[in-house]
Design a protein with these regions (language model features):
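TRNA-recognition modules of translation machinery and tRNA-sensing kinases, especially anticodon-binding
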Residues: 1-229
């Protein structure tokens, strides 16, 4: 159990997890509602702060049950176990490359070889804000062609339009501006470094400009391990 407010602040009120998928418990009139944790990063950060951990570089992993209701993703149950790698105290892009290499090695050691690694780079919050304004202008030109779900996301969480499963929408978004083409100098440098380091580590990947992830705290590197079946 965690305070519901923890996830509202960190994940964002308009995310699917907060708006549709959390199991919440009304624990009394004081408004201190609890929920079954839907993910682990916010909980890890809470534990780091509450326990006043002083290490400037804190690397941890965890494994445990998470809970989501309302049409969970394909292949995921309402209670599922999640493995987490967290690094607190460093903004080096090499940490992202290391996490990807570790996960790639983990799957290999498990004998799982049929997957593809998709990566993208979201830049800083300021760069994303500028990009979303450009994306919004583009969507205005095709607003009569996109689905109802994308119309809602356009106003509430615009980058989530790229998660749409509608084939017509996906085809239209092929012409949308790419966030990696709208990065600042430092972010562009980090994006290049990430790809170079993955190449050096022999991690095979595909750049997917539509990969954005669904939580508000995401910035810079985003990735998914995708199964063909």
């Amino acid at each position: 159990l965690e305070p519901t407010e923890l996830f509202k602040r960190s994940l964002g009120l308009e995310t699917d997890v907060v708006s549709k998928e959390m199991y919440t418990l009304d624990t009394g009139a004081d408004g201190d509602n609890k929920c079954l944790r839907p993910e682990a990063t916010a909980s890890t950060v809470r534990a780091f702060i509450e326990n006043k951990i002083q290490q400037t570089l804190w690397k941890v992993y965890s494994w445990g049950p998470m809970f989501r209701h309302e049409r969970p993703q394909k292949g995921r149950f309402r209670q599922f176990h999640q493995f987490n790698l967290e690094v607190i105290g460093s903004d080096k892009i090499s940490e992202d490359a290391q996490c990807l290499k570790m996960l790639d090695s983990l799957f290999t050691n498990f004998g799982i070889n049929e997957y593809a690694i998709m990566i993208n780079f979201l830049g800083t919050s300021e760069e994303r804000k500028a990009y979303t304004e450009k994306l919004n202008k583009h969507l205005d030109t095709i607003v009569d062609k996109i689905c109802k779900t994308c119309l809602v996301r356009k106003d509430k969480n615009i980058m989530r339009v790229f998660d749409c499963k509608n084939e017509t929408c996906q085809s239209l978004y092929n012409d949308a501006p790419k966030i990696v083409d709208n990065l600042g100098t430092e972010s562009e440098k980090e994006w290049k470094q990430l790809q170079e380091q993955l190449d050096l580590l022999s991690v095979s990947y595909t750049v997917n400009p539509k990969l954005v992830r669904g939580l508000d705290y995401y910035s810079k590197t985003v990735f998914e391990f995708v199964s063909p079946n």
